[in-house]
Amino acid sequence: MGKSLLRKTKDGKILHWNVEIDDSLCTLQEAFQQVDPNVGFNVELKFDDHIVYEQDYLIRVIQAILKIVFEFAENRPIIFSTFQPDAALLIRKLQSTYPVFFLTNGGTEIFYDVRRNSLEEAVKVCLEGGLQGIVSEVKGVFRNPGAVTKIKESKLSLLTYGRLNNVAEAVYMQHLMGIDGVIVDLVQEITEAVYDMIKPAKVVEKEDNKSLNGEGEDGEVKTKPQFSQRELSFLLKLIPELIQH
């Protein structure tokens, strides 16, 4: 039998995690040892949103994680990410092997630490600490699409997460905006749907000329959304208004 699992509710209560089959959580070391080494890891460092952490504590936690990473990661692709600004800066300061991304709600939720409250502040954190990029809640990007250009001009990568990323059209719009990647739940479904939107349109014609002169079955035409620069600019102005409601 594995150890009993506990879960923490949003109001801070600790409850037993009741499931059909109980098992213990694997350690980071076990994940490195048992998962295909070709599978990349996003090692997210999670901290309590409402605690102000001392730097010594953050250093101890991060050094313990880095010890496991450097011992067992081998050639596995890895990025680090965290919502905690000081932790993000320390991860980068303590190692330069793996990219570090700063997670942000992009202003969709307000925190005591102002560095967490906007994409503009996220850029400042990244530039201050030499981080590689930002991972934003997708609504934060749609509410402030102008920030994408500023982020790219700062030579930072931009990824997004959030429920809207399970909508193919929302992901396709981000492709048009120049966003570098998305975190999704429905990986295969979204990948296939967006691929169909991105790939060039195809016309399937009959070998004979019946489809050309109107006789017989018409050729099948697969289309993708087409936007002029003016239309795209209009959509980018409209999206923030839609997201507010």
Predicted features along the sequence, with ranges:
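Metal-dependent phosphodiesterase/phospholipase catalytic core, i.e.
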Residues: 1-111, 121, 129-142, 154, ...
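C-terminal active-site rim and adjoining tail of enzyme catalytic domains
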Residues: 101-245
